[in-house]
Amino acid sequence: MNTDAIESMVRDVLSRMNSLQGESATPVAASSSAHTAKVTDYPLANKHPEWVKTATNKTLDDFTLENVLSNKVTAQDMRITPETLRLQAEIAKDAGRDRLAMNFERAAELTAVPDDRILEIYNALRPYRSTKDELMAIADDLENRYQAKICAAFVREAAALYVERKKLKGDD
């Protein structure tokens, strides 16, 4: 396989990651991006690659096989930004896919939450793992520390459902 073919595959994978990542309650405030995305802007990687930046401010043009092999591009460079996710949310909303838009908004919020904390929250949300107070504390933490209002509402909703369905710690 030649370098051009591999580079093309890497670009395609990155393009798909940026256009598909983040599928999940009310959208957050309008995007702080300088762009307003419409369904005609999809896929961003093809139609507006200049709008797509990584968390380390790399552009799609930075993702070449040469840069990957020389460690100029790392796994950290591949993290999606909240701005890109919010642009995807705008596109979904423009396409009439409000639920998908909310999922992108929630994913945008989660970019501020450290991976270890996300795993802790995931485990805490499993049935019979947490008390209502513990879940409410998680919701407060998400809202106050990370400004993740959608995610906080999601955890509060889960807590209420767990009470109703007897899925809290000690209910089993």
From Swiss-Prot:
Query: By its UniProt entry, which SUPFAM superfamilies does this protein fall under?
Result: Diol dehydratase, gamma subunit
GO CC terms = bacterial microcompartment
Which key words are in the record? Bacterial microcompartment, Cobalamin, Cobalt, Lyase
Task: Supply the enzyme class, top level.
Answer: lyase
Gene3D superfamilies per record: Propanediol/glycerol dehydratase, small subunit (1.10.1510.20)
Q: Which cofactor does it need?
A: adenosylcob(III)alamin
Q: What is its EC number?
A: 4.2.1.28
**Pathways involved:** Polyol metabolism; 1,2-propanediol degradation
Report the superkingdom from the record. Bacteria
Localized where?
Bacterial microcompartment
Q: Which InterPro entries match?
A: Ppandiol/glycerol_DeHydtase_su, Prodiol/glycerol_DeHase__sf_su
Q: Which reaction does it catalyse?
A: propane-1,2-diol = propanal + H2O
Outline the subunit composition: The propanediol dehydratase enzyme is a heterotrimeric complex composed of a large (PduC), a medium (PduD) and a small (PduE) subunit.
Annotated family = Belongs to the diol/glycerol dehydratase small subunit family.
Q: What is this protein called?
A: Propanediol dehydratase small subunit
Q: Which organism is it from?
A: Citrobacter freundii
Query: Which gene holds the coding sequence for this protein?
Result: pduE
